[in-house]
Amino acid sequence: MPRAAAPPVQPAVPPKPIVTTTVIITHPACLQHEMGPDHPECPDRLTAIHDQLIASGLDPHLARREAPPATPEQLARVHDRRYVAAIQAAAPSSGLRYLDPDTALNPHSVDAALHAAGAVVHAVDLVCGGLYQTAFCAVRPPGHHACRARAMGFCIFNNVAVAARHALEAHGLERVAVI
């Protein structure tokens, strides 16, 4: 007597589709900030992130959002208003203008810095609003060394502090951990 075909094996728990829980926030202006041909803080940093997301297979599983520029009010939570105005006025029409030995502006740098700071504010809003569990800001110039009234260490605005202050003041959080 012929054997009946075995029924297909069903997994105990059906696999769940990958749900987009992470958003990447960036802006094309961040690729325009350049501090010279041999400077380590360069557009290739963002290109490398993009390339690795594709190579790893993660890219299709991530949401993408374009960063808005930070507002003067958002920056003023962390930076002296005179400093913000001075940075905006310091952008050269061509070439580079150095703010410190490590940090320079080109004609596109202020726009890039405003969008980098705006990205972190947008990330806080998206995560605190429950739209995503996590956010990654692929932006430059970086923003963790800048002081209240001074650029430093490749950083024009302190994006990390801008994000933390925004979380505290706009979303009513009591504490923020910066890791």
Give the residues covered by each predicted segment.
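HDAC/HDAC-like amidohydrolase catalytic core signature
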Residues: 2-4, 11-179
